[in-house]
Amino acid sequence: MEGLQPVRSLFTRFFQLEAASGLLLIAAAVLALIINNSPLSYLYGGLLEVPVAVQVGALNIAKPLLLWINDGLMALFFLLIGLEVKREVVDGHLSKPSQVILPATAAVGGMVVPALIYWFINRDNPAAVAGWAIPTATDIAFALGVLALLGKRVPVSLKLFLMTLAIIDDLGAIIVIALFYSGTLSSVSLLLAAACLLVLVAMNRLGVIKLGPYMIVGLILWVCVLKSGVHATLAGVALAFCIPLRTRNAESSPLLALEHALHPWVAYAILPIFAFANAGVSLAGMTVDSFTHPVPMGITIGLLLGKTVGVFGLTWVAVKLRLAALPAGAGWGQILGVAILCGIGFTMSLFVGSLAFAPGSSEYAGMDRMGILTGSFFAAVIGYAVTAMASRKTSIA
C-alpha cells in the first residue's frame, strides 16, 4: 500500500491544481475578450502576429507568436496528457478493465454524438464540416474545477469517473488530431522523427532514468514532427510514452517526477497563455444571426446537448446492460450533471478549432470561438446547478 502513496498524493495535487487553474483560465479568456473589443485591440492582434524566429545553422523556424504558443507551448500540455495517460494505463484507473468500461463507454458517446450533431447541422457546407471534431473535446481543467466547487458534496468516485473520462477523451482527441488534422507530409522529416522515437525507446529499454537526455531527444523529435506536416504537439505525447514510470530503485520514478514538475507550469502558465491567445473573439457587428450561423450553432449544441446525451446515454446503456456499475455513492442526477460538465470544451475545443479553421486563413476562425465560449459557459453553469441539486438530494437521502 505504501507504494501507492506517491500516486495518491500526485492525484490530490493534480486535482487541486486543475481546480485552481480554472479561475485563471476564465480570467485569461475574459481579459482577451475585453482587450480585443477595446481601443487596444490593435495591440492584441499585433502581439499575436509578432514574428519569432529560431535559427541553428541551416535549420530555421519562423512563426508568428500565436503559432509558437499553439505548436510549442501546447506540446508541453500534450506531454503532460501523455504522462497522465501512461501512468493511468500502467498503474492507475485505466490498468483494470472493470474500472475502464464505464468512463470509456461514456467518453465514446461524448465524442460521437457531438460530432454527429455538428455534422448534421453543417452537412451542406464542406468547408464548415472540417470543424466536426471541435465539440468532441472536454477541458479537464474547467470540468474538474467546476466539480471541485462542490467540495465534499460529491463522492470521490464521481470525481475519479470524470477525471478518467476526460483523460480517455484527451486520448481520443490526440488520435483525431493525428488522423484528421495533419498537413502535407514530409517523408524525410517523418523518418528523422521515427529515428528519434527509436532512440527514446532504446533509452527506456536500456534503463536510462535521467530526464535530461529524454528532453534533448524530445526537442529534436518536436522539430522533426513540426517539419513533417504532422501536428507538432503529438511529439509531446510520443515523448511521454517513452519516459519510464518504474526504475530498479522503487523509490524514484522519472515519469512521476516530470509530471509533478510540469503540472504547475501547465496549469498556471501554459493553459492561461493559450486561452488568452485564442479566446479573443471580436464582438464588433455581432448580431443574433452570428450565433445562429451553422458553425457556432453546431458547436454550441454539440457541446451542450451532444455531450450530455452522449455521456449520459451510453453510461445508462452500460449500467442497464450490466457491463459496469455506477460510481460508488453517486446517483443518476449526479451523472447527468457530470455529463453536462463534459460539454466544457474551452481550451481543447479552441485548440482543435485552431487546426480546423486556422486564424487568418478561414472565414470560420472567429465563429468557432463564439460557439466554443457560448457552449462551454452554459455547460459550466447548468452542469454545476444540476450536480449541486442532485448532490443535495443524494446527501439528504
Swiss-Prot record:
<dbReference type="GO" id="GO:0005886">
    <property type="term" value="C:plasma membrane"/>
</dbReference>
<keyword id="KW-1133">Transmembrane helix</keyword>
<keyword id="KW-0812">Transmembrane</keyword>
<feature type="transmembrane region" description="Helical">
    <location>
        <begin position="65"/>
        <end position="85"/>
    </location>
</feature>
<keyword id="KW-0997">Cell inner membrane</keyword>
<feature type="transmembrane region" description="Helical">
    <location>
        <begin position="183"/>
        <end position="203"/>
    </location>
</feature>
<protein>
    <recommendedName>
        <fullName>Na(+)/H(+) antiporter NhaA 1</fullName>
    </recommendedName>
</protein>
<feature type="transmembrane region" description="Helical">
    <location>
        <begin position="42"/>
        <end position="62"/>
    </location>
</feature>
<feature type="transmembrane region" description="Helical">
    <location>
        <begin position="219"/>
        <end position="241"/>
    </location>
</feature>
<dbReference type="InterPro" id="IPR004670">
    <property type="entry name" value="NhaA"/>
</dbReference>
<dbReference type="GO" id="GO:0015385">
    <property type="term" value="F:sodium:proton antiporter activity"/>
</dbReference>
<dbReference type="InterPro" id="IPR023171">
    <property type="entry name" value="Na/H_antiporter_dom_sf"/>
</dbReference>
<feature type="transmembrane region" description="Helical">
    <location>
        <begin position="335"/>
        <end position="355"/>
    </location>
</feature>
<keyword id="KW-0915">Sodium</keyword>
<dbReference type="Pfam" id="PF06965">
    <property type="entry name" value="Na_H_antiport_1"/>
</dbReference>
<keyword id="KW-0739">Sodium transport</keyword>
<feature type="transmembrane region" description="Helical">
    <location>
        <begin position="15"/>
        <end position="35"/>
    </location>
</feature>
<keyword id="KW-0472">Membrane</keyword>
<keyword id="KW-0050">Antiport</keyword>
<feature type="transmembrane region" description="Helical">
    <location>
        <begin position="299"/>
        <end position="319"/>
    </location>
</feature>
<keyword id="KW-0813">Transport</keyword>
<keyword id="KW-0406">Ion transport</keyword>
<dbReference type="GO" id="GO:0006885">
    <property type="term" value="P:regulation of pH"/>
</dbReference>
<feature type="transmembrane region" description="Helical">
    <location>
        <begin position="160"/>
        <end position="180"/>
    </location>
</feature>
<feature type="transmembrane region" description="Helical">
    <location>
        <begin position="265"/>
        <end position="285"/>
    </location>
</feature>
<feature type="transmembrane region" description="Helical">
    <location>
        <begin position="370"/>
        <end position="390"/>
    </location>
</feature>
<comment type="similarity">
    <text>Belongs to the NhaA Na(+)/H(+) (TC 2.A.33) antiporter family.</text>
</comment>
<feature type="transmembrane region" description="Helical">
    <location>
        <begin position="129"/>
        <end position="149"/>
    </location>
</feature>
<keyword id="KW-1003">Cell membrane</keyword>
<comment type="function">
    <text>Na(+)/H(+) antiporter that extrudes sodium in exchange for external protons.</text>
</comment>
<feature type="transmembrane region" description="Helical">
    <location>
        <begin position="101"/>
        <end position="121"/>
    </location>
</feature>
